[in-house]
């Protein structure tokens, strides 16, 4: 069994945590909320947030580490933020950010316009790079996955939208 839940979450300067029915984390990059699970107790002690199991709860051990990891991600998100980098590989594949909309040319007969949800910003340093930033780790990853799903990297030439750190294994073509 993992012991991630034992470690306290250290609060950096400027980050404030309020515990009630909902746990609210406020920081320089915004505010995030999550529901307090009944199987764990969350307590703020100075500059630390501790998570403890409730005795007798069936899924307390599972939720203990999960709640601690989610709180740590929330604290990191409102203090430093999260970002995900995507690359476009292919002839004529381009991206352009306009406000809260990302316009993509991915070889379809029409351009693809992807609207960003609240709390997520998009930048295009070059025409083939997309940088997704936000304070909610789950939301940043979800938006990146949605954009990648428009044109996943294909296995023969590697064309498509890929994560910057993704390794695409190229298959060899069939020989007679």
From Swiss-Prot:
Alphabetical keyword list: Ribonucleoprotein, Ribosomal protein, RNA-binding, rRNA-binding
GO annotation, cellular component aspect: cytosolic large ribosomal subunit
InterPro entries: Ribosomal_uL6-like, Ribosomal_uL6-like_a/b-dom_sf, Ribosomal_uL6_a/b-dom, Ribosomal_uL6_bac-type, Ribosomal_uL6_CS
Entries under SUPFAM superfamilies matching the protein: Ribosomal protein L6
Disulfide bonds: none
GO term, biological process aspect, one: cytoplasmic translation
Signal peptide extent: none
Single Gene Ontology MF annotation: structural constituent of ribosome
Pfam family, one: Ribosomal_L6
Protein family per UniProt: Belongs to the universal ribosomal protein uL6 family.
Subunit note: Part of the 50S ribosomal subunit.
Functional description taken from the UniProt entry: This protein binds to the 23S rRNA, and is important in its secondary structure. It is located near the subunit interface in the base of the L7/L12 stalk, and near the tRNA binding site of the peptidyltransferase center.
Protein name: Large ribosomal subunit protein uL6
Species name: Dechloromonas aromatica (strain RCB)
Lineage: Bacteria, Pseudomonadati, Pseudomonadota, Betaproteobacteria, Rhodocyclales
